[in-house]
């Protein structure tokens, strides 16, 4: 056995620069002198020599000129003939010749296969491999833009390779978007050039010299190169997300004023735009894009901050009419039936019809009623439109002096700016939710409302509950009596909490709500406001607002408890 070393010996011992063969095989600590101590101790000093290290691949190669001269001086091997002989596919030889200049950028090309040199000079003399027996790697690695009929002969290695328009196959303008996962990293940049690229590719049909087509081929071949992909999977996923947002997203708000014609444009080129181009089916140009979008949605989580292709309006010139018609006519559509989920009723209608709180409060009195009875989603855009109209009425008026009008207008602008600071976040969070998701959010709100109404019955303080838009959904009888209103009158139609506040209290409320709407998860706010009675009298309250949030941390219900100051 090997002698056990003392701690001092272990501390003083230093590793050798290079071990001998024996110490390397036996995993022993070798010394720098030759013969080493271990070999002398075992009487094998005559065979003590340094181990020959295996050289790494990039040190074994030669420079590019040396490699070419080596190939010219190396005699070619004769092709052995036998009862069953196979030859290298013409595409393999083309691939090896084409990849040599590209890989030479890494300073050392891979060793050339001798079977390429043994290829006959004529293509007809090669024994063809049946399509069923052809290796899959040969099919997958075929250069997409090179014509196999113009094969480079191995008998003339010094011949320069020239790529002309006759050697290049005309690429499909949209065929580069088929590989979704590997090519999304470059789609972000290619989107900026995609529209011009498609147009110029069709204009080049009448270009006889073919120079523009050659430039497009070189540009598009870079799109298929793996060199543009990142080595980090996380970085690739980041670019996939950016590709989703930039390539497929439409306008960020359903408001007609924010509609972007260029984003909604599907780039469908009509023959009238290119009257001199014939025999081109312009309807097929957008088909690969739609397949890519569907493939993105099916393969991984899809991110979109706007309308997708199936939800966007088809006529960009009539977007205003589209949204107005959608809000006024209450477009409804039934959801598809699911696989019999006992919790969510998939037969429930997805509708924009308004259901007043007086009906829902009487309809859903227990938790089981939410699952046994029909539930309708709440359409928040209509609520925000109604809120905007109400604010214009509150802060407007023709019987005011110019100073009062200016003061009210400044308050209205402050409120609208505060709403604009957090509403886009609400829209982005709920943009890609399907109909069942919206029904689930409404079910969550109604379920929470049941608990809070029971809590309000046990609490002595007057309470009002409203949605994040300010729309009242519940009020206790004592609070309604303080404000000289009937609870049924406040719940039978769309009424807002701001109708019961004075102007300064409305501005203060929106300042407080904007601070906790996004980012700040504070759930309790204490403040003092003034409420208006039905007879226009003002009552000062000290109040506590409790914020109930949904699964996106967006305010869902605001529970206001009011204590009048006498």
Curated annotation (Swiss-Prot):
GO function terms (MF aspect) = DNA-binding transcription factor activity; DNA-binding transcription factor activity, RNA polymerase II-specific; RNA polymerase II transcription regulatory region sequence-specific DNA binding; zinc ion binding
List the CDD domains hit by this protein, alphabetically: GAL4
One GO biological process term is: cellular response to starvation
Disordered: annotated span: 65-93, 250-270
Q: Where is the composition biased (Low complexity)?
A: 253-270
Cross-referenced InterPro entries: ERT1_acuK_gluconeogen_tf, PAS_13, Zn2-C6_fun-type_DNA-bd_sf, Zn2Cys6_DnaBD
Q: Which UniProt keywords apply?
A: DNA-binding, Metal-binding, Nucleus, Transcription, Transcription regulation, Zinc
Q: Can you name this protein? A: Glucose starvation modulator protein 1
Report the gene name: ZCF23
């Amino acid at each position: 056995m090997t002698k056990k070393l003392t701690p001092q010996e272990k501390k003083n011992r230093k590793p050798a620069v290079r071990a001998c063969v024996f110490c390397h095989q036996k995993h022993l600590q070798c010394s720098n002198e030759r013969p080493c101590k271990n070999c002398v101790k075992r009487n094998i000093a005559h065979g003590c020599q340094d181990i020959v290290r295996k050289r790494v691949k990039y040190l074994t190669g030669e420079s590019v000129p040396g490699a070419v001269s080596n190939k010219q001086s190396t005699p070619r091997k004769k092709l052995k003939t036998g009862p069953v002989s196979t030859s290298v596919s013409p595409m393999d030889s083309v691939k090896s010749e084409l990849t040599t200049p590209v890989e030479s950028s890494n300073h050392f090309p891979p060793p050339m296969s001798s079977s390429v040199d043994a290829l006959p000079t004529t293509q007809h003399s090669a024994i063809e491999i049946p399509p069923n027996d052809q290796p899959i790697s040969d099919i997958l690695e075929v250069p997409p833009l090179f014509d196999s009929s113009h094969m480079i002969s191995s008998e003339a290695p010094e011949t320069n390779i020239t790529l002309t328009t006759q050697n290049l196959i005309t690429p499909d303008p949209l065929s580069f978007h088929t590989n979704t996962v590997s090519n999304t990293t470059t789609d972000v940049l290619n989107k900026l050039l995609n529209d011009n690229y498609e147009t110029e590719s069709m204009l080049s049909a009448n270009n006889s010299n073919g120079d523009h087509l050659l430039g497009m081929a070189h540009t598009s071949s870079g799109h298929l190169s793996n060199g543009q992909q990142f080595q980090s999977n996380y970085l690739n996923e980041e670019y996939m997300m950016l590709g989703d947002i930039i390539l497929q997203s439409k306008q960020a708000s359903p408001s007609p004023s924010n509609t972007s014609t260029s984003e909604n444009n599907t780039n469908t080129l009509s023959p009238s735009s290119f009257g001199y181009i014939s025999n081109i089916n312009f309807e097929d140009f957008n088909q690969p894009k739609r397949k890519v979008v569907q493939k993105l949605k099916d393969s991984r989580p899809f991110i979109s901050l706007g309308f997708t292709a199936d939800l966007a309006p088809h006529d960009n010139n009539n977007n205003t009419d589209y949204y107005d018609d959608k809000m006024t006519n209450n477009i409804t559509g039934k959801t598809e039936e699911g696989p019999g989920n006992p919790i969510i009723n998939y037969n429930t209608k997805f509708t924009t019809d308004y259901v007043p709180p007086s009906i829902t409060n009487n309809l859903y009195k227990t938790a089981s009623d939410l699952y046994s009875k029909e539930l309708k989603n709440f359409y928040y855009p209509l609520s925000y439109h109604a809120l905007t109209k109400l604010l214009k009425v509150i802060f407007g008026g023709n019987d005011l002096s110019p100073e009062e009008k200016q003061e009210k207008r400044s308050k209205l602008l402050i409120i609208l700016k505060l709403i604009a600071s957090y509403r886009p976040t609400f829209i982005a969070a709920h943009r890609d939710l399907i109909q069942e998701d919206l029904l689930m959010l409404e079910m969550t709100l109604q379920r929470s409302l049941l608990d809070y109404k029971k809590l309000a019955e046990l609490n002595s303080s007057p309470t009002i509950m409203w949605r994040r838009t300010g729309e009242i959904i519940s009020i206790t009888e004592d609070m309604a009596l303080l404000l000289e209103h009937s609870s049924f009158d406040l719940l039978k139609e769309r009424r807002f909490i701001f109708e019961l506040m004075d102007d300064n209290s409305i501005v203060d409320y929106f300042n407080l709500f904007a601070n906790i709407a996004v980012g700040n998860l504070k759930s309790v706010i204490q403040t003092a406001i003034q409420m208006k009675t039905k007879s226009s009298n003002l009552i000062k309250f000290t109040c506590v607002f409790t914020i109930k949030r949904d699964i996106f941390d967006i305010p869902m219900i605001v529970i206001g408890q009011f204590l009048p100051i006498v």
